[in-house]
């Protein structure tokens, strides 16, 4: 399975404290209509940290059901508890997801050996494609290129990484050590085009929740060798990318989708509504981009 192009780290809509299945299905359909290449439910943007285990499973199930095989579904299934990650990954496979996005264990701060053994343990019990999710700003631990190379060499299930450091030196080293068949996806919307230029294959995007066509078109243009179009779209996306991170993700992106009329503005504590000054900035940026 190739995970290439623009994948949306899709939000989880809530209504009255519960997952809003109707709006979620509508969002999925809109994403597909807009040409997105794949979807990632239950990631950071999907507020996986505040979903119950039953809700987590429901969100994956709904996403797979609604997609109906039209595009790949890469299900968020990671945990800092290895046994829990195994259970979530097993469910993702049974539900029909095409792969699992597995965050490096957070809070525990494992060594590189601990990271290696974590992913090895998951693969020993569930055989499906894994994308390792490296986001040190949230986990407190960076998985090194050498460790990824070891995983890639020893564990066939580890087919790529979502690299959210924005560090192009690290991206280059990953591709150098793992080879160009290893799938490196950007986890940083600001550096998608530079990552593609050194051999990355796509992005797992926050911004594409709002502008799926623009993000996927940029990836397609680059793949087709149309660098002028890719560069133009990169700069058109830049102010929207900044807007999506005015405050902690997914607060701005859920606010944007609510302004667009696509979801209710509801998130779970400890996330809270966007500050008024940032709401005004967000609205202005979206209006200038023709989104509102």
UniProtKB/Swiss-Prot annotation:
Subcellular location field: Cytoplasm
Catalytic activity annotation: L-aspartate 4-semialdehyde + pyruvate = (2S,4S)-4-hydroxy-2,3,4,5-tetrahydrodipicolinate + H2O + H(+)
UniProt GO MF annotations: 4-hydroxy-tetrahydrodipicolinate synthase activity
Swiss-Prot/TrEMBL keywords: Amino-acid biosynthesis, Cytoplasm, Diaminopimelate biosynthesis, Lyase, Lysine biosynthesis, Schiff base
Entry's Gene Ontology BP terms: diaminopimelate biosynthetic process; lysine biosynthetic process via diaminopimelate
Residues reported in the UniProt entry to bind pyruvate: 45, 204
Active site location: 133, 162
Entry-linked CDD domains: DHDPS
InterPro entries for this protein: Aldolase_TIM (IPR013785), DapA (IPR005263), DapA-like (IPR002220), Schiff_base-form_aldolases_AS (IPR020625), Schiff_base-form_aldolases_CS (IPR020624)
Chief location of this protein within or outside the cell: cytoplasm
Pathway: Amino-acid biosynthesis; L-lysine biosynthesis via DAP pathway; (S)-tetrahydrodipicolinate from L-aspartate: step 3/4
Annotated Gene Ontology cellular component terms: cytosol
Marked site (Part of a proton relay during catalysis) residue numbers: 44, 107
EC nos: 4.3.3.7
Claim: Nucleotide-binding is one of the keywords in the record: no
The keyword Cytoplasm belongs to this UniProt entry's keyword annotation: yes
Sequence similarity: Belongs to the DapA family.
HAMAP family: DapA (MF_00418)
Record function comment: Catalyzes the condensation of (S)-aspartate-beta-semialdehyde [(S)-ASA] and pyruvate to 4-hydroxy-tetrahydrodipicolinate (HTPA).
Assembly notes: Homotetramer; dimer of dimers.
Protein name: 4-hydroxy-tetrahydrodipicolinate synthase
Annotated organism of origin: Nitratidesulfovibrio vulgaris (strain ATCC 29579 / DSM 644 / CCUG 34227 / NCIMB 8303 / VKM B-1760 / Hildenborough)
Name of the gene this protein is made from: dapA
């Amino acid at each position: 399975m190739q995970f290439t192009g623009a994948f949306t780290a899709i939000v989880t809509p809530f209504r009255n404290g519960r997952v809003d299945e109707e709006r979620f299905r509508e969002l999925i359909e809109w994403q597909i209509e807009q040409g997105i290449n794949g979807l990632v439910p239950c990631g950071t943007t999907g507020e996986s940290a505040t979903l119950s285990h039953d809700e987590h499973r429901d969100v994956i199930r709904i996403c797979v059901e609604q997609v109906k095989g039209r595009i790949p579904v890469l299900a968020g299934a990671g945990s800092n508890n290895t046994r829990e990650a195994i259970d979530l990954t097993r469910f993702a496979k049974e539900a029909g997801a095409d792969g699992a996005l597995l965050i490096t264990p957070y809070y525990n701060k494992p060594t590189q050996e601990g990271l290696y053994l974590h992913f090895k343990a998951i693969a020993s019990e569930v055989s499906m494609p894994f994308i390792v999710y490296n986001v040190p700003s949230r986990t407190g631990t960076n998985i090194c290129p050498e460790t990824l190379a070891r995983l890639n060499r020893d564990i066939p299930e580890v087919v790529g990484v979502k690299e959210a450091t924005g560090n192009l030196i690290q991206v280059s080293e990953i591709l150098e050590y793992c080879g160009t068949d290893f799938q490196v996806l950007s986890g940083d919307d600001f550096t998608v085009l530079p990552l593609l230029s050194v051999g990355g294959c796509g992005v797992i995007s926050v911004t594409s929740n709002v502008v799926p066509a623009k993000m996927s078109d940029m990836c397609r243009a680059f793949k087709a060798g149309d660098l002028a179009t890719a560069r133009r779209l990169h700069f058109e996306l830049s102010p929207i990318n900044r807007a999506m991170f005015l405050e902690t993700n997914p607060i701005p992106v859920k606010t944007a989708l609510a302004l667009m009329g696509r979801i209710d503005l509801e998130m779970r504590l400890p996330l809270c509504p966007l500050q008024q000054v940032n709401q005004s900035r967000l609205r202005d940026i979206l209006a200038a981009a023709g989104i509102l």
